[in-house]
Amino acid sequence: MINRFSIEKVKGLEIIDSRGNPTIRVFVRTNDGVESFGDAPAGASKGTREAIEVRDENGLTVKRAVDIANYIIDPALHGIDVREQGIIDKILIDIDSTENKSKLGGNTIIATSIAALKTSSKALGLEVFKYIAGPRLPKIPIPLLNIINGGLHAGNKLKIQEFIILPIKFNTFKEAFFAAIEVYRNLKGLISERYGKIYTAVGDEGGFSPPLEETREALDLIYTSINNAGYQGKIYMGMDAAASDFYDPKKEKYIIDGKELNPTQLLEFYLDLAKEYPIVYLEDPFEENSFDMFGELQNKLNSTIVTGDDLYTTNIKYLKIGIEKRSTKGVIVKPNQVGTISETFEFTNLARRNSIKLVTSHRSGETEDNFIAEFAVGIESDFIKTGAPARGERTSKYNKLLEIENKFGLEYGGKYFYL
């Protein structure tokens, strides 16, 4: 008897992401004709320990990744029960046989892994978030909205990569999200008034890139916008420093705001900012090997969630180091960094067991697929990072969260969040 859940076909397709770059979409179809897909996102700022993408012609195509899906992965997964996520991912890992997924490509593998999960949930007639959550009743995560861009995400002189708002003190996700939109609109008007309308054009993640030179200029703009919108004490602030990008390893200095700072001086810089602004979130404040400096900052900023992205790259090996050194209270969760859904689950489960906050994140190169929103709800992520409330590939995620809240009545995580 044919198993209706068995995989009948795996097929790759070259598509484009939100930056116009090629990426891979993988379809997985069962014997019963149930089919879904997974898209591989791509980052601009990447940790050196991330899974390696397979690309051709200086990154201009992913034809080889498509061929890998069609001619290597397809026969390898043929006949496998699509509900067996662990088995599917192990097959992919074993065929690849490299630590950084460079043989099959992290992009090919994660697209296949996502496609299998989505096809399985569809075959069982379940929403993706319900399939992941199981019997648990999850909450809607608090959004981290990147509304001013710097670093590799912008063309200005700001070194900090993302300036973020966190709408926390609200009863529902809808209330929180639309309050954040008010701040975003207020900021747009402020930038237009001070720097000209041309600087209200949005970047890769929907944030603005005004001609600013120093960190406090950006923080002042956002703080003013929060106050003007009337949300002081309800909407807080955060930053993704992406400090590896402004670290000079030869000098062992951080080049920021026209100064060269050693690690201790940079730590003091962050402490001063936390005194001046309602900053409750600080991501990648030091370069990606500085577990001890992360821990020292977290110890001194107890009410701020210091978070590791490049520090961990969603890899359990590095998370164990961070746990041992008590480096952070938060971890970024990006499935494409490690390559499979199963490995991502291992990472999030270990973080949860150690009371570390989960921050599920998009990448700067995204597609219109809203999988990451459902994934964030399913794992009961504390936060979700998916850009500003602009650009279709960002708003598709927010709209999915609004839909889930409206349809299933899930509670908002901010309602129970204490700083």
From Swiss-Prot:
Alphabetical list of InterPro entries matching this protein: Enolase (IPR000941), Enolase-like_C_sf (IPR036849), Enolase-like_N (IPR029017), Enolase_C (IPR020810), Enolase_CS (IPR020809), Enolase_N (IPR020811)
Pathway: Carbohydrate degradation; glycolysis; pyruvate from D-glyceraldehyde 3-phosphate: step 4/5
Cofactor: record remark: Binds a second Mg(2+) ion via substrate during catalysis.
SMART domains in the cross-refs: Enolase_C, Enolase_N
Keywords for this protein: Cytoplasm, Glycolysis, Lyase, Magnesium, Metal-binding, Secreted
GO biological process: glycolytic process
EC number, UniProt record: 4.2.1.11
Main location: cytoplasm
Record GO terms (molecular function): magnesium ion binding; phosphopyruvate hydratase activity
Localization (cell): Cytoplasm; Secreted; Cell surface
Annotated residues for binding of (2R)-2-phosphoglycerate: 161, 334, 363-364, 385
Cofactors demanded by this protein: Mg(2+)
Gene3D superfamilies linked: Enolase-like C-terminal domain, Enolase-like, N-terminal domain
Catalytic residues as annotated in Swiss-Prot or TrEMBL: 205, 334
Cellular component terms (Gene Ontology): cell surface; extracellular region; phosphopyruvate hydratase complex
UniProt record similarity statement: Belongs to the enolase family.
PANTHER family the record matches: ENOLASE
Name used for this protein in its record: Enolase
Chain's gene name: eno
